[in-house]
Amino acid sequence: MKPLIALVGRPNVGKSTLFNRILRQRSAIVDPTPGVTRDRHIAEGEWQGKQFLLMDTGGYNADGDTISMAMLEQTLMAIRDADIVIFLTDVRAGLSYEDLELGRLLQRTFQHKQLFFVVNKVETPQLSLDAESFIKTGFTAPYFISARDGSGVADMLDDILESLPETEKQLQEKESAIQLAVVGRPNVGKSSFVNSLLGSNRLIVSNIPGTTRDAIDSRFIRKQQEFILIDTAGLRKRTKIDAGIEYYSSLRTEKAIERCDVALVMLDAAPGIEKQDMKIINMAVERKKGALLLINKWDLIEKDSKTSKIYEETLRSNMGNLSYVPVLFISALTKKNLYRAIDTAQQISQNRSRKISTSVLNKFLEEALSHTHPSTKSGKELKIKYMTQINAAWPVFAFFCNDPLLVQANFRKFLENKLREHFSLEGVPISMRFMQK
């Protein structure tokens, strides 16, 4: 297991900027609005050949509102989980009451943690002089840095990583986890789903749409298979995104889909499927990802023995050509079908990466063609000679024929349905290419 480094501090001291500086990418959302990073956000990093996990947190804030209290709880959980804590302060703002409270908490309650006291935004000679006052706080000797410009960050990382032993396992560790993007419109229950699976309040859950702003990775193991759950801010209509933060969050959702193996598209059972839901599903299909539709809050629906069947029939009538996407009725609150959803997603991932030998495919083709005759066009008959699978991240099949222009839509659909039925390719897009031979 890679060592975990947590960035903690009050809102807007530059935690996300330092997070991005260390990882050399724009990963956490950076904005001058306090509280932009609400949840614990974890990413893998490397410095001087040593690998680690870096955790960005929502700011430590003693305000009494619901979100601030939840952010405080997340900060405390981050400290408990971490091997090393970077306590970040802001030289421009000086030491605040929150800084002193957090510092005392770290020294009193978490004295066994390895602590690095860091003063950020030291970007001018005058600010360097101002930073000297932080030495008298009684905390560990501070590091003076500028996360924005990068000054002092390398020296800080050298000292932090110096104490982290590198194991052979760490060097040889390979990524074999199945990546699942939990996506959907705001407030459909994505974070509750992740929290129920992980058994801890990993993400801030609130009935306020948009509570989860970043895409946040969580790892867990089920039946000896490692999974990475990517929880995202809900995708809203572009017309409703009236601020930069919401734009970045929606962009993060799209990127989460791009890097996942299977998209878990979550709907609220009450309103049912809407245009924006279809947009999200199509986003996964266009990127050739596996897809699973989760109908959440099923426990709140009045139902009888036929309700789920009627609901699914209505749902599929609005889904057009996406009948291959499986549907599961779940409840993040009662945990109904939660683990079945993960098992189904694992099967979809396996379907997506399945390799079928050419001999098996051509035996299938011979059997399929014995039940139908390809239609003719302009008096010319389509003749398929053989087929094979092309190496790709999803099932791509090449059919070699006398004239690709003779292939009509109904015959293409016939072959797709037969392929899905015969090889159990549920939940994954199929590409078929007809080539002249």
Curated annotation (Swiss-Prot):
Residues 3-168, 178-353 form the EngA-type G domain. One of its GO terms (molecular function) is ribosome binding. Keywords: GTP-binding, Nucleotide-binding, Repeat, Ribosome biogenesis. Signal peptide: none annotated. It holds the Pfam family MMR_HSR1. InterPro entries: G_ENGA (IPR031166), GTP-bd (IPR006073), GTPase_Der (IPR016484), KH_dom-like (IPR032859), KH_dom-like_a/b (IPR015946), P-loop_NTPase (IPR027417), Small_GTP-bd (IPR005225). Associates with the 50S ribosomal subunit. This is GTPase Der. It comes from Pelodictyon phaeoclathratiforme (strain DSM 5477 / BU-1). The gene is der.
